[in-house]
Amino acid sequence: MERKKWFDKKFQFDLTPDKYSSLLKKLNETPHTISRLVSSLDEKVLIIRVNNRWSIKENVGHLIDLEELHDGRIDDFIAGKEILRPADLNNQKTNEANHNSKNINDLTERFKNVRENFVKRMKSLDVKILSSSSIHPRLKQPMRPIDMAQFVLEHDEHHIDTIKELIKSVNSEN
C-alpha cells in the first residue's frame, strides 16, 4: 500500500499541554533512530535513488536543512507573528546541497546537533508563548508550539518510513 504524500496529509492539532515534554523527548530521539538505521549501510545503498526520489543521505540531509525553518518558526512564536514563515515547498536547499557527497556519520551527527538545539529552544519557551498560536502558511490553520512539535515529529516519522522503504527496496533487489 502506498503511503500518503506529505503534502496530502491532514493535521488535527488538539494535543494537550501535558504531551509537550513527551513530544520533545521523541524529537530528540529521531537522530539516534536514524543513526541506528543507516550507520552500517554500504555507501551504494545510502546514495541510491529509487524512482528518482531522494536517497537515504538526501532524506537525512533534508531533515537537517529543515531545522533552520523550525528554529525560525520558534522566533516567529516569540515575536508574536500572526503567520509563521513559509517553508520552501520546492526543497531547493536539499536539492542543491549534494548530501550524497557527505559522510553519513557526519550527516547524522550534524542532525543530532541541530535537533538538540531546536529541542533546547522549545524547552525554554515560557507559558505565554506555549499557549500562543500562529497560522501555518501551507495548512492555513492555527499552530501552537506543541502543534509544531507534533508536526515536526510526524515529518520525521514520514522520512524514517521513507528510509526504511529505501533499505527494504535495495535489499530486495540484492
Language model feature labels by segment:
Residues M1-D14, V45-N90, S133-N174:
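Short, contiguous alpha-helical
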Residues D8, Q12-D14, S21, N100, ...:
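Compositionally biased, intrinsically disordered low-complexity regions enriched in proline and serine
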Residues L15-D18, L41, W54, H99-K102, ...:
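Short coil/turn linker and secondary-structure boundary residues
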Residues P17-L27, K57-V60, S101-T108, P145-A149:
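Amphipathic, non-membrane alpha-helical segments in soluble helical-bundle scaffolds
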Residues K19-N52:
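Short, contiguous, helix-prone interaction/anchoring segments in small proteins
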Residues Y20, Q92-N95:
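Charged, low-complexity, helix-prone segments enriched in Lys/Glu/Asp/Gln
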Residues K25-P31, R36-L37, T94-S132, V152:
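Acidic/histidine-rich alpha-helical segments that form the ligand environment
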Residues P31-D42, E68-D71, D75, K112-D126, ...:
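Structural signal for well-ordered, non-membrane alpha-helices
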